[in-house]
């Protein structure tokens, strides 16, 4: 099968993928994020996967208590949700299936990566985001958990989040792509832990060859790679 086969509408859909809708919106102050999974599926996301050569099974939606108010209450609700997400992702990967999680704000990545890490030896993470999401409960001005996902899976931050990740991701197996808006505390963490990062400025100055080099370096260290992308 050549790469052109993915562009053929009649290509056989043989690659199984589990699509996990997660209607999480309490990790950020951005309205509408909780509605994204249902919206994408309504517009034909599953059908688009079939055209690309995947046999998609849409799993039951992970429902979130998006109406809770207050930082502490939201943190508790998020912690409970990402534990559920962790178990689903771990179970699907353990069955040999690929998982595509649809959010929702990026706080859900704590659960998806936690599950993938438990089911995979030496996992690598590619984090595609304009923001580092490397704040902690102590360094965050807003208290929004969507800005703490990366730090949590690496083992930094509030125990209510880090405890969800039973198998922490190694900092050497983590790659940022697309950074352009960071807090100083996040910059300090990335520097102190020597986490690989390709910023938007790097891409503008050096182009995609630099990006390809960093991805290849990650592939040499990690057996499997999980991609977490915030749009």
Predicted regions and their residues:
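Conserved alpha-helical scaffold segments that buttress catalytic/binding sites
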Residues: 2-231
């Amino acid at each position: 099968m050549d790469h052109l086969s993915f562009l053929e509408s009649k290509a056989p859909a043989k690659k199984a993928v589990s699509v996990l809708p997660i209607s999480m919106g309490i990790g950020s102050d951005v309205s509408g994020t909780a509605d994204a999974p249902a919206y994408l599926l309504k517009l034909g996301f599953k059908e688009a996967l079939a055209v690309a050569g995947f046999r998609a099974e849409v799993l039951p939606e992970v429902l979130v208590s998006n109406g809770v108010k207050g930082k502490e209450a939201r943190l508790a609700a998020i912690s409970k949700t990402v534990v559920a997400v962790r178990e689903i992702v771990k179970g699907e990967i353990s069955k040999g299936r690929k998982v595509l999680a649809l959010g929702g704000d990026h706080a859900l990545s704590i659960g998806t990566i936690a599950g993938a890490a438990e089911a995979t030896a030496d996992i690598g993470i590619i984090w595609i985001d304009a923001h580092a999401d490397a704040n902690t409960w102590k360094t965050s001005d807003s208290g929004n958990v969507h800005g703490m996902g990366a730090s949590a899976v690496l083992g930094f931050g509030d125990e209510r989040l880090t405890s969800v990740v039973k198998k922490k991701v190694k900092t050497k197996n983590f790659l940022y792509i697309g950074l352009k808006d960071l807090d100083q505390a996040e910059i300090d963490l990335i520097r102190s832990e020597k986490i690989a990062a390709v910023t938007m400025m790097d891409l503008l100055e050096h182009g995609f060859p630099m990006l390809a080099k960093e991805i290849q370096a990650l592939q040499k260290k990690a057996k499997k790679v999980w991609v977490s992308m915030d749009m």
